[in-house]
C-alpha cells in the first residue's frame, strides 16, 4: 500500500485530490493533512459517508504548515503510526495554501513558500527511495 500525505486536504483541491486517489488508486493509503482538526475530521466523515470502505485507507493528520512545531509533531505522528516501516511514505502532495492578499505578504509566504519547505524538510526523510513529491 502506497501512503501519500496531502496537505490542505480538508477542502477544495486537496479534498478532491484525496477523493480521486481513493477512487482511482486502490493501492493507496491517504494521510489527510489539515490545519483545523475539526474540519479534517469532517472531511474524513464526508469521504467515508460517500464510500464506507475508504475508512481503512484514510487517516487525518493535524498539520499547520506555517508552524515548525506543528510540522515536526506531524512527522513524528506519521513515524509512530507506521513504526513498522522505516520509510512509511510513498508521496507528499504539498497542497496547503492561502490566497488572500488582505492578510498581508508574510502569512502568505509562511504557508505558500515556507510551508512547502517545512513539509519537505520534515517528511522527505520518511519517503521510500522511489517516492514522489508534488
Name what the model sees in each region.
Residues 26-42:
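Conserved glycine-rich Rossmann-like NAD(P)H-binding loop of the short-chain dehydrogenase/reductase
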Residues 95-100:
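Conserved NAD(P)H cofactor-binding loop of Rossmann-fold oxidoreductase domains
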Amino acid at each position: 500500500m502506497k501512503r501519500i500525505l496531502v496537505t490542505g486536504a480538508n477542502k477544495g483541491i486537496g479534498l478532491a485530490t484525496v477523493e480521486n486517489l481513493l477512487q482511482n488508486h486502490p493501492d493507496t493509503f491517504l494521510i489527510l493533512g489539515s490545519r483545523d482538526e475539526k474540519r479534517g475530521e469532517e472531511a474524513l466523515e464526508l469521504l467515508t459517508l460517500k464510500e464506507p470502505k475508504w475508512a481503512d485507507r484514510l487517516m487525518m493528520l493535524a498539520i499547520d504548515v506555517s508552524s515548525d512545531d506543528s510540522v515536526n509533531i506531524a512527522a513524528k505522528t506519521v513515524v509512530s503510526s507506521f513504526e513498522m516501516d522505516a520509510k512509511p511514505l510513498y508521496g507528499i502532495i504539498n497542497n496547503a495554501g492561502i490566497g488572500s492578499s488582505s492578510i498581508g505578504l508574510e502569512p502568505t509566504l509562511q504557508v505558500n513558500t515556507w510551508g512547502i519547505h517545512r513539509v519537505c524538510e520534515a517528511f522527505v526523510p520518511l519517503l521510500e527511495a522511489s517516492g514522489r513529491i508534488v
